[in-house]
């Protein structure tokens, strides 16, 4: 990290792309001269393609929080427009209707989006603003999370039915209510964290609960298009163990069927509502000591979809979990992508 002035920090992550250097080619770019939305083809690599750079800038401007992320996947000037990805976000908390909201302005250049059975698509260029309120609270043991947001943006992205780029302004309203109802509760023997809690930052709430999810969305586009849906889901979650013993002392399983009632269409691929019926599944299992296996998947149960019965989103990770941090490697079979994750606990 580099301290830039008093209020800004720059994180730089140079990368050497070993696979490209060994193979001598890459399928990360379109044919020279083709549209940026064209099909990726095999292209020969040079020394400039073996290096990449991820960077992040964080800081404050008066009462606003600024974050920018940049990715450069090649230093070849002929590929630079494809190799560069950028997003920025300027936000602050405000008081609105006697509630605390987060107000943000953002800009995007070439952001990848995975949209269920539609697959990977891309926002080529976009800028906009969002007003969002999020609250989490507990009443009689029932944990609730509520999100309400309003957004307005100008977006250039892949069209819904072809690879052409189309531009449209978009306004949207989104509401979510998650609830977790305890059915069988196993209270921890000690509510205080002591030396026996080597792997977790706080005692685990064991038992059986019913989780429910309600989502509402309405989107309007200047092309005259509009789309909306109501999403309902309910399913069990089981948590067993204390994560204190050496092995197999923690298991978490959740199953959540979700059904969407939708109408209308988007002009874009990235936000088109798809997959009316899905099954969300998660499974976490302590293996030995701080080593934990985590997995999640979304199964497409929409009988009208060409991907009926397929996993449209999936992730497997092997993590090293300690009280103050969690580090792991992950792989996503649905898009054959992987990486490294790192989380700190107890920091805001």
List each model region and its residues.
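Long, low-hydrophobicity, solvent-exposed regions enriched in small/turn-prone and acidic residues
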Residues: 1-348
């Amino acid at each position: 990290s580099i301290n830039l002035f008093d209020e800004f920090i720059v994180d730089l992550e140079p990368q050497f792309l070993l696979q490209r250097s060994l193979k001598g080619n890459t399928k990360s770019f379109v044919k020279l001269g083709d549209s940026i939305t064209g099909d990726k083809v095999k292209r020969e690599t040079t020394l400039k393609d073996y290096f990449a750079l991820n960077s992040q800038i964080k800081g404050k401007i008066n009462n606003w929080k600024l974050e920018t992320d940049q990715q450069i996947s090649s230093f070849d000037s002929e590929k630079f427009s494809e190799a560069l990805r950028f997003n920025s976000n300027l936000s602050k908390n405000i008081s609105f209707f006697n509630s605390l909201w987060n107000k943000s302005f953002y800009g995007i250049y070439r952001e990848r989006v995975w949209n269920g059975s539609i697959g990977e698509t891309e926002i080529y260029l976009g800028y906009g603003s969002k007003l969002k309120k999020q609250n989490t609270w507990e009443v009689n043991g029932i944990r609730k999370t509520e999100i309400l947001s309003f957004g307005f943006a100008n977006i250039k992205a892949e069209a819904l039915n072809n690879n052409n780029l189309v531009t449209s302004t978009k306004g949207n309203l989104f509401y979510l209510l998650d609830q977790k109802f305890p059915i069988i509760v196993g209270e921890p023997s000690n509510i205080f964290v002591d030396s026996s809690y080597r792997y977790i930052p706080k005692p685990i709430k064991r038992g059986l609960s019913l989780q429910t999810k309600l989502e509402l969305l309405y989107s309007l586009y200047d092309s005259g298009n509009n789309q909306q849906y109501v999403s309902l889901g309910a399913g069990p979650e089981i948590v067993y163990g204390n994560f204190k013993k050496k092995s197999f002392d923690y298991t978490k399983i959740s199953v959540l069927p979700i059904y969407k009632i939708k109408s209308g269409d988007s002009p874009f691929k990235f936000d088109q509502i798809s997959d009316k019926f899905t099954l969300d599944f998660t499974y976490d299992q302590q293996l030995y000591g701080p080593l934990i296996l985590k997995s999640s998947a979304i199964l497409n149960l929409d009988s009208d979809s060409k991907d009926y019965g397929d996993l449209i989103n999936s992730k497997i990770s092997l993590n090293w979990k300690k009280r103050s941090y969690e580090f792991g490697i992950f792989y996503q079979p649905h898009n054959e992508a992987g990486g490294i994750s790192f989380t700190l606990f107890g920091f805001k």
